Each structure stands twice: as C-alpha cells, then as structure tokens.
C-alpha cells in the first residue's frame, strides 16, 4: 500500500488522510490547547474520497498519521454497459472495469477521455459535475 506519515499538527484542510484505511479529504481540523494533565489534541473531520462518508478522529498533535498517495490518471472509455465502464489507461494501456456513479452515468460516452484516481488499490472515475 502506498502512503506516507505525517504528524497531526502538520495537517491542513484540503489535504488527505487515511482513516480506517480509507483515503479521506480533510474538511475541518481543530486543535485544542494542552491541558494540565495532557498534551494538545487535534480533531479531524474528513470525507471519504471513494465513498463520500463523513469520518472524524481525535489524536494527540504529535501522533503520526498515514497520508495516502493518490495517483491521478487519465483513461479512455472503451464501452459503457449496465452502470459500468470499461476503461483503458492512457499510459499503460491496461484495461479495467469501474462502476459508474448515477450522477455521471449519462455523461460518460465511449471514446472520451476521463480522469480517474487510484489510491490504496481502489479506483474511481472523477468527472466534474
């Protein structure tokens, strides 16, 4: 699996983090002050890149978290059938099938180039709505 490590205090809104081994985009991060008996804590709220689920975690600011390496690639659509698209990677010419989200199913047509993201062994078509 491809990831890096970073401390919680280094994170910013808009960056990515692994929560429960799922790549998520940080939408909110708050740091508390150190208390009498403990160090400062960071509360991170993030939304899953591939499943759009909201997740939140609390860690000490010196805690090391995993940062996913997200590869952004392009592929050509070979065919569309039953809410699935067969794609061919533009660089490696590898063919694979990905499910289509209902919002973008009518926009994806055979022959067009589409961007897709790959992280932690999962791929998703990332068309702009």
UniProtKB/Swiss-Prot annotation:
This protein's UniProt keywords: Cytoplasm, Hypusine, Initiation factor, Protein biosynthesis
Primary location group: cytoplasm
Compartment(s) where it occurs, according to its Swiss-Prot or TrEMBL record: Cytoplasm
Entry-linked Gene3D superfamilies: 2.30.30.30, Nucleic acid-binding proteins (2.40.50.140)
SMART domains in alphabetical order: eIF-5a
GO CC entries: cytoplasm
InterPro entries named in the record: IF5A-like, IF5A-like_N, NA-bd_OB-fold, Rib_uL2_dom2, Trans_elong_IF5A_hypusine_site, Transl_elong_IF5A_arc, Transl_elong_IF5A_C, Translation_prot_SH3-like_sf
BP GO terms, sorted: positive regulation of translational elongation; positive regulation of translational termination
Domain of life: Archaea
Modified positions (Hypusine) in chain numbering: 36
SUPFAM superfamilies reported for this sequence: Nucleic acid-binding proteins, Translation proteins SH3-like domain
Gene Ontology MF: a single term: ribosome binding
Record's keyword annotation contains Repeat: no
Function: Functions by promoting the formation of the first peptide bond.
Family that this chain belongs to: Belongs to the eIF-5A family.
HAMAP family assigned: eIF_5A
Protein name: Translation initiation factor 5A
UniProt organism field: Thermoplasma volcanium (strain ATCC 51530 / DSM 4299 / JCM 9571 / NBRC 15438 / GSS1)
């Amino acid at each position: 699996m491809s990831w890096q490590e970073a401390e919680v205090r280094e994170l910013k809104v808009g960056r990515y983090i692994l929560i429960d081994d799922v790549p998520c985009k940080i939408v909110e991060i708050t740091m508390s002050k150190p208390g009498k008996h403990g160090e400062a804590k960071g509360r991170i709220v993030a939304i899953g890149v591939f499943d759009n689920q909201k997740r939140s975690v609390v860690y000490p600011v010196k805690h090391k978290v995993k940062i996913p390496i997200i590869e952004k690639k392009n592929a050509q659509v070979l065919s569309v059938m039953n809410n699935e698209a067969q794609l061919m990677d533009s660089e490696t010419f590898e063919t694979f099938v990905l499910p289509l989200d209902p919002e973008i199913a009518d926009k994806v047509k055979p022959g067009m180039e589409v961007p897709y993201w790959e992280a932690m062994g999962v791929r998703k078509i990332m068309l702009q709505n």
